[in-house]
Amino acid sequence: MAGGMSVDTRRWCFADQLGPHFLDAPDQPVLLIESRSAFERRRFHRRKAHLVLSALRHRAAELGDQATFLQTRTYREALDQLDEPVSVCQPTSWAADRFIRSIPRIPKIEVLPARGFCTDRATFADWAEAHPTLKLENFYRDARRRLDLLMDGNQPAEGRWNFDADNREPAPTSSDGLGVGPPWRPDEDEIDEQVRADLDRWERDGDVSFVGRDGPREFAVTATEAQSALKVFLRDRLPHFGPHEDAMLSGDRFMAHSLLSAPMNLGLLDPLDCAYAAEDAYRSGQAPLGSVEGYIRQLIGWRDYIWHVYWHFGRGYRRRNALEAHGRLPKWFADLDSDAVEAHCLKDILAQVRDHGWVHHIPRLMVLSNYALQRGWNPAAVTDWFHRCFVDGYEWVMVANVVGMSQHADGGLMATKPYTSGGAYINRMSDYCGECKYRPSQRVGDRACPFTGGYWWFLDRNAKHLANNQRMNQPLAGLRRLRDLDDVVKQQRRLGGRAP
C-alpha cells in the first residue's frame, strides 16, 4: 500500500460512499465505477437497483469533470483503464475489502480508514477488549460520553440514558393514526428516466433479473436531497417518533420514522451530523427528549454497533447457524408473493416489501424475521433475502441484524435470547389482528395464528439449544405445561413451507 497520498490523489468512491464526507477536499478528483456484474450476480429488488444506479449517476453528474465515471461490466475492467494512483476509504464488506487489497497494482492504491460511522474500528476494538460481552447498552452509553451527545456534564440529559420503556406504546386506535406529516419525497428527473430505461433493457435482454415492483423513486439520491429529507424529519416527524417507534399500523407504513436509512447507507448523510442535528432539536425545544434519544440511539448505538459486530466476529460470522436451521425459503416468500398469504400482518408487510423495498424495523424483526425463525429457515438464506430485497440493505447491515439479532444463529454472541413471539405481541403492537382470519390467542385449529403456533413449535424444536439460557426459563416452562403441544407441532409441520 502506498501511504500519505495528497488530496490531489483521485478518490475511488463506491456506490455507498457518495457523500462529501468521503473526500478530503471539495475539489478532490473522484473515481466512480458502475459495474453491471453487481446486478447480474444476485436477484435484487428492482427499486434497490434503481436507487443505487440513480445515486451513482447523480453523483457523477454533480461532480462533472472532477470525476472519472466508468461504466463497465466488472470493476476490474474499469480499473484496467486507470493510469494514476487512487485512494479509497475502506469498503463496507469483507468481499469488497479483499478485492481492493488483491488488485495487482497494489503500490498505486491507498486504503484509508472507513468513514460514514460515528465510532471508528480502532476505538471499538479497544472497547470490545474491555467489554467482552459486547452489550449494546454499554457501547451506546460509552458513545454518548465520548461524542458528548445528550449529556449534561458527566450525566445524561434529564438524568436518563434510555427511554426504551417509554417508547413502546402500542399502535393508536384513532382513525387518524399518528397524525404526523408526510415524509419528504423526491421529484424524478432525466437521470431517473435513463436508469429506468437501462434496467428495463437489461432485464429484457436477459442480463439481469429482479424481484419486486418498479415505481416512483421514494428516497434521496443526492446529498442535497438527503439534507432536505433530514430537515423535514427533524421538523415534522422527530417530535412524534419515540412513543410509537415499536408499533405497526396497516394503513401507515411510515408512521414517524425518518426514512433516512437508505440515503445514509448510500453515504449521503453523515450519521454523526444527523445525531447532533437531532440533539439541537431537543435543546431548542422542538422535540422531546424521549424521541430524540430513541433516534440518536439508532444512529450512534444500533447502527454503529451492527457495523462493528460485522467486522469484529470475522468473515465466518455470516455462516453461523447455532440453531441448525436448514429450511429453504419457500418460493412465495422469496418472490414476495403476498397474494399467496392470508395472515393479515404477513400479507400486508410482504406486499410493502414487494412494492417499495422497505418497511420499518419492527415489521422486519417481529413479522418477517420472526416468521423465518419460527419456520427454521437457513439464516444465510434469510440474510441474503433481506440484503437483496431492501433498498437500505447491505452486507454489513444484514449479517449482524439477521444472524445475530433476528435468527439467533450466533448462539447468543450478540443478543441474549431469540427475538420471537406469538400473535399476542403483534395484536398488542399493531392493528392487524382485528381483520385477520386467524386469532392470536389460538394455537391449534383452523383459526390458529401461524405466529402463535409457530412460537411454540420453535421452542419445542430448540428446547435443548435454549435450555441453558436463563432468559428462556419462563418460556420453556410454559412449553412444558402445554397439554396440546403434540397437536400444535403436527399442525405446524403440516403447514410446512406453505403460505399461511
Provide a role label for each language-model segment.
Residues W12-D16, I33-E34, L70-R73, V88-P91, ...:
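Short His-Asn-centered micro-motif
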Residues R59-E62, Q81-L82, S102, A277, ...:
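A generic secondary-structure signal
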